[in-house]
Structure formats: C-alpha cells, structure tokens
C-alpha cells in the first residue's frame, strides 16, 4: 500500500475525559491510544502519515513525532486551528499532502485503540477490488448510542450516515453504526469536502455527509462490516477507556496462553502489548508485566509481582517482587518482597531474597543477597554472599559513591559498606563491621571492639522497671541454683570413731 496516505484525527478536545492529559494520550496496555492507532496504520506501509492536531497540540504533536520516530517513519503534523468538525479536520489533513498525490486516503481516529492492521488491510482490499470511491468500516452494536447510524437501501446499498444528534426515532433504532474509518479516492474526497455544510444539530462540517455526496455524484460506496465491535470501538470517557483496556488485556493474555505460556489467573494478570514471554513460563495471580519487559522460557513469575521494562533470563524465579528497568539472569531467584530499582543487574543463578532493595547495582553470577539488605551503587563479583541486614552506604548527603565487592567474598550480618570502598576477592567481614577502608583480598575485616558488660546498670538506671524486677528475680534464681549445685557436689564429712 505504498501509494496511499493515512490521516489520523487527533484534534478533539476530549472534554468527557475530564483530564489535563489529551484524550488520545491516555494509555492502555502500555501505549497511548494515539500510539495504538499509529502502530496499526504503520503496518500498512503508507507513503504519507498525517496526524491532525488541534486543542492540546503542544502535547499531542510532539508525542506523534516521537511515536513516528519509534516506528522509523516520517509523520506530518496538520493543525486544525478551529474545531469545525470532522470534515474540516480531514480537510486540514489533506492540506499536508503533496498537491500531486492521487492515491487512496485512509481516514481513522486517534481514539480507536483496538483497531488493527489486518482490519485496515481488509478495508483497502475491498476498496481496491470494488474500484470504490469510498469504503467505510461498519459494525453492529447492541447499544449504538453516540454513533452515527448506517443508512442503506432495501437492497443493502449504503446511501449515507446520520449522526445521533440528527437522527429520527426510527433511525436511532438502527444498530449498524459507522466506525469512523474510511478509505477514499482522493479526488472524490476533495470534491465532497468542498461541498460540506453546517446545517446540522452541531453546526459543524461532518465528514459523514461526504458519503451521501459521493453517492449523489454517482460514485461507488462500499462498506466492510466488522463482526467484532471492540476492534472499532472508540473512547470518550474513562469508563470506556477501562472497558477497552480490560478487553485488550484479555486478548493479550489469551495470545500468550496460545503461544505456550501458563497464566494461572487471567483475570488478575495484566500484560502490556510490547511484553514478550517465552514458552513454558508460568505467570501466577496478581502479576503485572509492563512496558518492554521480556521474560524468558521456563520462568516462574509471581504471584503479586510487577515488572516494568525488566529482562528475565530463562528459568528464573521472581516472587512477590517490584522491579523497574532491571535485568535478572538465567536461573536466578528473586523474592519474596524484593525491590529492584533502575540499573539493577543480577547475574545467572544469583539470588536476591526477602526484603532486599537494589539500585544501580551489578551483582555477579551465583552471588547471593539473601535478606534484609540495601545494595545501592555497587558492583559485586561472582559467588559472593552478603550477610543479612547489610547496608551499602552510598550517599553522604551530597555525593553518591560506589562500593566494589570482589568474588567469593563472605560478609557477616549487619556489615556497613561506607562508599567509596573496595573489598577484595575472597575477603571476609565480621558481623557488625563498618567498612570504611579497603579490605585486601583474603583478609578478615573486623571493626567491633571487645564486648563490655556493665553489671547492675538496669537496677541503677531503671529502678522499679519490669526489666529490673526480672533481673533481680533471675539473680535470685541464680543464687539458689548455685547453692543447689554446690550442695550436690560437696564432699561428705569424714567419719569419726567413737
């Protein structure tokens, strides 16, 4: 479809969303609605792609250009200065095309997120096969409220579209509706647009009126009925956004299941459209896989896990974990209750256990951080073990510094690494050690001094407390026990003769 142009209408105010964010930039399944529309039409390979913006153009136009860059194609921006209706918006879009363009013009909207390339391709194929001047998508809805109704002759020919506000009672009973997706011959479109009028309930230039004008000129009008209404459903408010988001998620989840992924509870599992998952992976309830997350094969993910832009290697287990912009190596085990902040890279067969938080940290193959530890701005080698309750002290209030831990290192519980500091390969640290200076390879670092017990401190400093009473009772019990032990071990007195 190289000799074609696509015009995406994204100029509406979207007032029913009641949001400072433009309607077409609201997201579902990891993409804005505009991005969904642009991905669908980009699959057709059109020569020109025009996005018409109006209100909120300062947000919508840059977003459209960024999406185009991601898709690797040029996007032209057309501005609708005044909101004068869909017909006027398309006219603004045509102005962005070269004057000598003579191909097919596909018109769609930026708020139809489930519309796919296959449906658009079917529209184009029918348009070409029938040598039509205009071809439109229609669907049938149980509740057609808000949609334009399709008007047909007794023999089924499409003769026009009537908008809800202008429809009679009998016309409002029609359940076949306009999907607002069209393929026009550019000549027929230009001619019809030049004759649109505002004599309607909204006082606007309706693109839908172009259908009757083309037919009145003797042009060929064809329709493609879409049996799945969700594919062409639009979004006007947050209720519809949530409904379509749930429907899209259901389809995404089902596609992964058919590809060999076990999803235990689809109702509580949310997967963005750009996520990839390998075969024989099990996704447990309450899991969200978001953004560009890529999960390998034979993994176990969840329950109650959220991963955003995280790469998970084959055979890894990730349990009750929240992770963002991180990497988890093959065979690694993460969780439960682990927090992976951006920049975390866990090597193959590594472990990050309960209540471990990591940030901007590289953790080598086979290294374990089992529990209750913060690892920030650190590089840890292979097959090391970080004891419980250790803290990588990376921030002095002004500057963040890195800690480097070698391979085959064993650190005792409650070790503090005050960055910048380096611990050499094979070194050990004692429990409760504060590492302020580098530790040579193979050394044992101990910073705690000898333990000192201050006898009677509680009785003197906390008299009358429960602690003092318990200590006094223990002391008394100890004296009694000592006396009993002394009696048991005492030698009997020597016998005397009489």
From Swiss-Prot:
Class of the enzyme per the UniProt entry, highest EC level: transferase
Functional note: Catalyzes the last two sequential reactions in the de novo biosynthetic pathway for UDP-N-acetylglucosamine (UDP-GlcNAc). The C-terminal domain catalyzes the transfer of acetyl group from acetyl coenzyme A to glucosamine-1-phosphate (GlcN-1-P) to produce N-acetylglucosamine-1-phosphate (GlcNAc-1-P), which is converted into UDP-GlcNAc by the transfer of uridine 5-monophosphate (from uridine 5-triphosphate), a reaction catalyzed by the N-terminal domain.
Transferase is among the record's keywords: yes
Protein name (database record): Bifunctional protein GlmU
Alphabetical list of PANTHER family matching this protein: BIFUNCTIONAL PROTEIN GLMU, NUCLEOTIDYL TRANSFERASE
InterPro entries: Bifunctional_GlmU, GlmU-like, GlmU_C_LbH, Hexapep, NTP_transferase_dom, Nucleotide-diphossugar_trans, Trimer_LpxA-like_sf
UniProt keyword Magnesium present: yes
